[in-house]
Amino acid sequence: MKTVILVVIALMVIEVQGDGYLMVRAGIEKGCKIWCVINNDYCNRDCKLKGGTYGYCYFWKLACYCEGLPESSPDIWTYEKNTCSP
């Protein structure tokens, strides 16, 4: 019984983290991925400002990718949130 309680408490303490492309949330590019070419510093800084652990420029997609964001973060780009019109 103590083990079950310990597991439940551990699951409540562990924060679920998500990875994904950073998304523009305002302005003319709202809903688009944050684009980049080779600027890892910019992507890393923006990722950390949004609560992530590490960000980098994913060259093949030309977009900032962020690791360690909270799963419920509104800053992760998904197809459902894609309101970007090229």
From Swiss-Prot:
Main location: secreted
Subcellular location: Secreted
A GO BP annotation: defense response
Keyword set includes Signal: yes
A single Gene Ontology CC term: extracellular region
Domain LCN-type CS-alpha/beta: 19-85
A single GO molecular function term of this UniProt record: toxin activity
Distribution of this protein across tissues and organs: Expressed by the venom gland.
InterPro entries: LCN-type_CS_alpha_beta_dom, Scorpion_toxin-like, Scorpion_toxin-like_sf, Scorpion_toxinL, Scorpion_toxinL/defensin
Keywords: Disulfide bond, Ion channel impairing toxin, Neurotoxin, Secreted, Signal, Toxin, Voltage-gated sodium channel impairing toxin
One family name in Pfam for this protein: Toxin_3
Family of the protein in this entry: Belongs to the long (4 C-C) scorpion toxin superfamily. Sodium channel inhibitor family. Beta subfamily.
Domain statement: Has the structural arrangement of an alpha-helix connected to antiparallel beta-sheets by disulfide bonds (CS-alpha/beta).
Protein purpose: Binds voltage-independently at site-4 of sodium channels (Nav) and shift the voltage of activation toward more negative potentials thereby affecting sodium channel activation and promoting spontaneous and repetitive firing.
Protein name (Swiss-Prot/TrEMBL): Neurotoxin LmNaTx34.1
Organism of derivation: Lychas mucronatus (Chinese swimming scorpion)
